């Protein structure tokens, strides 16, 4: 296929953190008249919705982690099957460029593309390069990064190929970014949003309702809480909020309009995945960020530190994320509107709303340069 009528293969794991930036890029590429095919794993069936691709192919994948040698061996066998399937897909499509968004589901299609001499572009959303991207980086044509700071974990010989584009965000996020920060009056209404990423987070359901119940009664009476909670945690969260004397509350397993709910919030409590951090920055909302613990790479801690250093967020390790500590944080922040307003402005200043367009331009440039060699 020629660059004049290009096809771009996107590879992304089937979670929101990987799919959202891929979706944003796909929309920009489609606007340029470029055909997009998405390669992903079976999880996409629950999260992809109407992904803007002319074709979606599911490729076997697994993560070779854990202590069990048997489990790791089985994962490697699955990845091998995925690689064989990916070779067939890449040969059939003959893409101008293959773009990977991290996670082990991207390894088979990107490795197949590299072996077939298709130009490959990696997008690293986090402040620490993931293991899959690090494995693929040596053979990548170019590496796009979501953060301006030096990304840790990039192989030394691949560092010269880095380009900072920012993290692409969905159209719904760009629409929400047009909403000004809500006014903060001394006795006026307050809105708190709590969520744990596209997969939810139990710790939010364990800590946030208990913390809200500890707030002063006058503060609770002004407060509306919107929280994403896992289905098994809904009843408990609703019961606690129902007894707290709040102005209003809403608890659900998933919010399709989450960007709009971010825009309506005075303060957000969330994990610090790359997409969440990028969306908070583009919309311009202050947040208490609780990085996911236990990660070998500590990527969420690094992401939270980026916004924290900008004055846009208040990072809290999960060991310190207790009802008592969160109640103190909420009381202090809601009692100091100037801190929230300053953090909102700092978040807005850290956002890159045109990241999808920057990345699309880099994809096209990569295809053109490859075609002229």
Curated annotation (Swiss-Prot):
The keyword Plastid does not apply. It catalyses: di-trans,octa-cis-undecaprenyl diphospho-N-acetyl-alpha-D-muramoyl-L-alanyl-D-glutamyl-meso-2,6-diaminopimeloyl-D-alanyl-D-alanine + UDP-N-acetyl-alpha-D-glucosamine = di-trans,octa-cis-undecaprenyl diphospho-[N-acetyl-alpha-D-glucosaminyl-(1->4)]-N-acetyl-alpha-D-muramoyl-L-alanyl-D-glutamyl-meso-2,6-diaminopimeloyl-D-alanyl-D-alanine + UDP + H(+). Keywords: Cell cycle, Cell division, Cell inner membrane, Cell membrane, Cell shape, Cell wall biogenesis/degradation, Glycosyltransferase, Membrane, Peptidoglycan synthesis, Transferase. UDP-N-acetyl-alpha-D-glucosamine binds at residues 15-17, 126, 170, 198, 300. Pfam families: Glyco_tran_28_C (PF04101), Glyco_transf_28 (PF03033). CDD domains: GT28_MurG (cd03785). It is a peripheral membrane protein. It is an enzyme of class 2 (transferase). It is found in: Cell inner membrane. One of its GO terms (molecular function) is UDP-N-acetyl-D-glucosamine:N-acetylmuramoyl-L-alanyl-D-glutamyl-meso-2,6-diaminopimelyl-D-alanyl-D-alanine-diphosphoundecaprenol 4-beta-N-acetylglucosaminlytransferase activity. GO terms for cellular component: plasma membrane. Pathway: Cell wall biogenesis; peptidoglycan biosynthesis. GO terms for biological process: carbohydrate metabolic process; cell division; cell wall organization; lipid glycosylation; peptidoglycan biosynthetic process; regulation of cell shape. Its EC number is 2.4.1.227. Belongs to the glycosyltransferase 28 family. MurG subfamily. Cell wall formation. Catalyzes the transfer of a GlcNAc subunit on undecaprenyl-pyrophosphoryl-MurNAc-pentapeptide (lipid intermediate I) to form undecaprenyl-pyrophosphoryl-MurNAc-(pentapeptide)GlcNAc (lipid intermediate II). HAMAP family: MurG. This is UDP-N-acetylglucosamine--N-acetylmuramyl-(pentapeptide) pyrophosphoryl-undecaprenol N-acetylglucosamine transferase. It comes from Methylobacterium nodulans (strain LMG 21967 / CNCM I-2342 / ORS 2060).
